Curated annotation (Swiss-Prot):
Record has Hydrolase as a keyword: yes
EC class name: hydrolase
Identification of the protein by name: 3'(2'),5'-bisphosphate nucleotidase 1
Keyword DNA-binding attributed: no
Originating organism: Dictyostelium discoideum (Social amoeba)
Amino acid sequence: MSKTLNILELTSACIKLAQESGDIIRDVFKSGSLGIEMKSVDDPMTKADLLSQQHIIGSLRTIWSDIKIVGEEQCEIPTIDKKPPIDLLANDKDCIEKCPEEFKQLPIDDLIIFIDPLDATREFTLGRVGCVMTLIGISFKGKPIAGIIYQPFVDCNGDGTTDQSKWVGRTIWAIVGGGIPVKGIKDRRAPEDVGKVILTTTASHFNDKVQQAVDAIKPDKLLRAGGAGYKSLLVIENQADVYVFPTVGSKLWDICGPHAILLAVGGKLTDPQGNDIIYSTDPEKIENKNGIIITISNHQKYIDLLKNFKN
């Protein structure tokens, strides 16, 4: 019989580890010694990426040694003695009242944790830290069930800043199912943007396919930004209506955490043809080869616009 775990306990541990990851990232940034290495063209890795991932995975292994974990970076995982807390949500009224009972005994074999220890690494190396975040997603039988986003470089209003004296960090998390409210988000739509169609897409990997998608949707406003997690959050918090990246580049660790949060607020994420993303440890399926489209509403409308434009 498969071992089981309580999703509230696993989410508790991941929340705390994402926050501690933020401490690591801030410390590396403040040191000025980022230890930048290039994994490939325009794909940097820093000391903060490695230390963050080692801390998260090493800590999770102290409790759940058998759970499948997929992290962005290829690195050795050290032995860690300190166990992360699993009781952060034990007194959360929403969790107590609304978490489905079956979520408290999920078979470990059906779970995968996806970790992007430092999303928007390129922006991090350039000092544009407002879009930097740690992403942790948990999938169950191929579908997102919980997600955590931690933003290290934001102020008390949740706005990115380079002013170190204002860094307080922000945690956003959700468990999909049962109606547990998403924690840490707010509607950030500017009054002047009400009624507009706002599209967000890549800043650093803009190409002909991306331009074609923009032309197909014809947004009133275009937001080009770094970090898949950051752009997903723009949609989750209603700053953008749709995030389109219709080409290779994003990976499952970029989207699993945001995908869970998106589902919990009623949004949707698929590939640009409308096909569901299946979360797997298969190396051939880690990359979203057809790209992604993320919406808070009217998902099929945007799928149709892309299809009609292509045809």
